[in-house]
Amino acid sequence: MAGKARVHELAKELGVTSKELLATLKEQGEFVKSASSTVEAPVARRLRESFPSAKSADSAARPAAKPGAPAPSTPATAAKPGGPRPGPKPAAPAPAPVAPAAAAPAATPEAQAPAPAAPAARAVTPAAPATNAPKPGRPTPAAPAPAAPAPAAPAAPAAPAASAPAAPSTGAKPGGPRPGPKPPRVGNNPYSSAPAERPAPRPAPGAPRPGAPRPAPGQGGPRPAPGQGGPRPAPGQGGPRPAPGQGGPRPAPGQGGPRPSPGSMPPRPNPGAMPARSARPAPGGRPGRPGGAPGGRPGGGGGGYRGGGAPGAGAGAPGGGAPAGGFRGRPGGGGRPGQRGAAAGAFGRPGGAPRRGRKSKRQKRQEYDSMQAPAVGGVRLPRGNGETIRLARGASLSDFAEKIDANPAALVQALFNLGEMVTATQSVNDETLELLGGEMNYVVQVVSPEDEDRELLDSFDLTYGEDEGGEEDLESRPPVVTVMGHVDHGKTRLLDTIRKANVREGEAGGITQHIGAYQVLTELDGNERLVTFIDTPGHEAFTAMRARGAKATDLAILVVAADDGVMPQTVEAINHAQAADVPIVVAVNKIDKEGANPDKIRQQLTEYGLVAEEYGGDTMFVDISAKLGTNIDALLEAVLLTADAALDLRANPDMDAQGVAIEAHLDRGRGPVATVLIQRGTLRVGDSIVAGDAYGRVRRMVDEHGDDVLEALPSRPVQVVGFTSVPGAGDNLLVVDEDRIARQIADRRNARKRNALAAKSRKRISLEDLDSALKETSQLNLILKGDNSGTVEALEEALHGIEIDDEVQLRVIDRGVGGVTETNVNLAAASNAIIIGFNVRAEGKATELANREGVDIRYYSVIYQAIDEVEKALKGMLKPIYEEVELGKAEIRAMFRSSKVGNIAGCLVTSGTIRRNAKARLLRDNTVVAETVTISSLKREKEDVVEVREGYECGLTVTYSDIKVGDVIEAYELREKPRD
């Protein structure tokens, strides 16, 4: 093969499959990717040497005669046309074709090899006149036969399309001798009518090559019987072809096409000398023509090359068609223009119209789903069948698209068509995700923070909230009691009395602004018992703190002032305790004050499900006076009795510690400090811990008295030092094996928290609000700094709850625990923000830097003062609202004209006051003629005046020339309207 050969071509040539050839190449160390890859000439030569058996089998398997053809015999004196004869080598001199390697010469006519046959089912019945006798001793070339001979076409007494050459004395005529047979083409031969197993070797360069694109005799297609083909039948000896007139308009033998004799090789007619051919098959080109007229070849092959042949026309005659199965043909003829060829692998499926591939069920299902998919604004979206999609808080459209295998750009465009402007990577709030999911028939389920944290811990093979071990590992622990109630009802005074201390005076404004945790030793039935108390603030801004206190507790003491009754924060505390399924003991405080009515408190609390025992309920009420210390022991006894009766206070102290951060703040000398309540396990110095998005290692633990603690058992509140950052109030504390795990958990929590905060704080902009959103809006940027994280959280929630017009936006760009630093000042200067310090002061040179940069720092110690001032600042940023106030009216009584000032109106002030430079409108017959005019000058007598009151005459000029007698000038001014 010339040049580089492809693997599949070599496989066909060698008679093996491409897979076998690829395996052989791999064994030889040659890297070939696929059957379409090319190989170098040395590699191809080695492959041919590796398959000698295929070549020998090729020659040995060639049949001597196809089924249905008689065996060759010695030539008779009178050969019948169409009779089977062996094809001897013609006696006329002709260029000797080079025989293939598999061909063997025959010494005698009886031992000659069969004539070459095409590898398909072409019918060939060679015949020769009696005068053409084979010459013995002349070798006859034999072409390789196909590996499996195809069955012969229906036998018809017709001469072959190209018979063997005749004797040299016959001369050149249509039935004259033809050049020696050539080997068939390769398997993907477009002129063949049947597939071949493997290609045959090419003829030697000395063999004649046809000049026209028509297939050579013996090559174009299969013949019914092999043989070297005798001479064509003489004129008048054509087979019983049912053509009218035995050949009809066929030319005479001497006038046939310029078919050359063997002596004038290569005498193939050039295309210019050939008769014109039609793209349509001629009448003779229909399949199955049984025979040919005298001097003609068998019926024109169906769909011959560029058209069929005329009835009875020979191969070289005008209109002669190619053998059956040519280009565009089907096996047996009858091809139509545009149809595929019959060669296997050459032009697709053998014969017939182009075949469309069948679609699989999956493709059909995808097409059906695509047709049924919802379209929002022309955008095709996936169709959900009510499936539930779980998304984290603050998820983006890219996260949503990844869950449903969709294009994020399509979701962005769909939301745009729904009136929402969101980018693909922007954190989206829950409502928008649910809206988009509903359009696609998906149920979007936003994962709660608790589920998010549980899934995160599961990924690290950690659990929270369960005791390890069996019942024998559990030990009793002290109860955790939370003191709750309305502000100024005496919660902190009660704890002071219990602790024999004074904490209340240290609170700014006399109100508790953070949670305190203490452990108190008390006696019950002569036994000393430990009780852990948690004090929660009662101000309305500290709702989250009260909720955390209720979740971390075993039992709640509800403090209600006997002289004040049930207040809003009292009801809220009841709801928090009932939501946490926590038993409640009611302490009716301030019974020593005048007007105290404990029975009224019992009646009011009955409405909220707290029925006293004396009324037949199960809630214990204790009347106390925290100021005088009345019935404090009875209250503690009631707490312990309720805890023992309703609760199973046991925990496993031998497991890794788990707890909750009650409070956290940034200490100047110790760094981040967290007040932690241990719920199960034992916390020791040196443990790796993670609480929320903060992590670290326990460096020191301190109790409520300031003493160092080496280990903290369940229900023990301690202050933990060693966090890298300040944890959030209410965050769960967990002990892990390594600092690396703690850092990874904290980083993931921080990322989720940041996404959720971005989705919550970002204001949704719809297309209807786009115009107003593009206008310049006022925005108040704040930086919050506090003494502990719970206070900062409460302050931020309260500030976000301020109801203000959409013209002004409040944005907290940074928050933190500790004093105001220079970094905070630089950020405030860059973003034009105000710094609010709550119970903290500026550190170092932060104050000097703030004065130099012009940054406003506000300090507060009571939370509601900060809220009020921020609300006033927001209202001050609103654009002023003006209202129109009427000043007075003046009627024009006379007109004067002046060359300097124009028209002068002589007026009488009928009501109010007319002022100079005031805005006015001109009325004529109670109709507004000019809406906005200005009183440019005002005179009384001949003196300029500022205003003229009712009942006086005046002269004035206005910035409007078309004034008449009888017009009324109505003066007014615009005054700023205060905001509500």
Curated annotation (Swiss-Prot):
Main location class: cytoplasm
Subcellular location: Cytoplasm
InterPro entries: EF-G-like_DII, EFTu-like_2, IF2_II, IF2_N, P-loop_NTPase, Small_GTP-bd, T_Tr_GTP-bd_dom, TF_IF2_bacterial-like
UniProt key word Calcium: no
tr-type G domain location: 476-647
Low complexity bias spans: 52-68, 99-135, 155-172, 185-197, 273-283
Record-level GO cellular component terms: cytosol
UniProt GO MF annotations: GTP binding; GTPase activity; translation initiation factor activity
Annotated region (Disordered), positions in chain: 28-382
Region annotation G5: where it falls in the sequence: 625-627
Top-level lineage group: Bacteria
Residue spans of biased composition, Gly residues class: 285-338
Family as reported in the entry's similarity comment: Belongs to the TRAFAC class translation factor GTPase superfamily. Classic translation factor GTPase family. IF-2 subfamily.
Name of this protein: Translation initiation factor IF-2
UniProt organism field: Rhodococcus jostii (strain RHA1)
Underlying gene: infB
